[in-house]
């Protein structure tokens, strides 16, 4: 009898985010923290892609000719800016509800994104490949991080790159990202993050290494409550982002 196929999908996580789908593009709604967080993510992604592929970030469509996957794209908060910068963008999410919201918003703004209700393993098994993969705030929500990273890594073309943003598994992160953000300030619905599923940088580096990806840049991201804004930082105790590269053949 064949073994059941391994999956990266955590059904509870998909259900949780599907229930919030209508809120994706409301900057003052349930995803307000993500809207606040988005500018620092976008600037990091834009600058690093431009540097790695020799593009001028000041050009009108600097990412023309690049194929980008946003895995776990939600409502498309990263897909649309990448498409406006000229990239061919595939936005994938396990939640069909999220994908429908993303499609509707893109159509309203006349932005072309190839949205698909699918998984990393299905895309990888279909032979899809990309110059850039955006893996942002997803690894802490999957059922099998090693399989997920392996399947994503399989889709990165030689010389291509993958961004990963997540939350460190530290007591500081427990206090700020879970207790503070979800239970005290109520920035996020309770249960959005589970402490045991948060990912330490060394764990992420090991998973990436197993997928033939090498970390070439990393940065912390911290919140300034006085300025009400996020910024890059050396402090990786809570939120952090890494950039990993697949070597050329």
UniProtKB/Swiss-Prot annotation:
Q: Which residues bind S-adenosyl-L-methionine?
A: 41, 72, 93, 136
Entry's Gene Ontology BP terms: methylation
- Catalysis performed (reactions): a 3-demethylubiquinol + S-adenosyl-L-methionine = a ubiquinol + S-adenosyl-L-homocysteine + H(+); a 3-(all-trans-polyprenyl)benzene-1,2-diol + S-adenosyl-L-methionine = a 2-methoxy-6-(all-trans-polyprenyl)phenol + S-adenosyl-L-homocysteine + H(+)
Q: Which NCBIfam families match?
A: UbiG
Q: Does the keyword Methyltransferase apply?
A: yes
Instruction: Provide the family line.
Output: Belongs to the methyltransferase superfamily. UbiG/COQ3 family.
Q: Which UniProt keywords apply?
A: Methyltransferase, S-adenosyl-L-methionine, Transferase, Ubiquinone biosynthesis
State the gene name recorded for this protein. Answer: ubiG
Source species, domain of life: Bacteria
TM segments? none
Task: Report the protein name in the record.
Answer: Ubiquinone biosynthesis O-methyltransferase
Q: What InterPro entries does the record tag this protein with?
A: SAM-dependent_MTases_sf (IPR029063), UbiG_MeTrfase (IPR010233)
A single GO molecular function, which one? polyprenyldihydroxybenzoate methyltransferase activity
Q: What class of enzyme is it?
A: transferase
What does this chain do? O-methyltransferase that catalyzes the 2 O-methylation steps in the ubiquinone biosynthetic pathway.
Fetch the Gene3D superfamilies from UniProt. Vaccinia Virus protein VP39
Q: What is its EC number?
A: 2.1.1.222, 2.1.1.64
Recorded metabolic or biological pathway in which this protein acts: Cofactor biosynthesis; ubiquinone biosynthesis
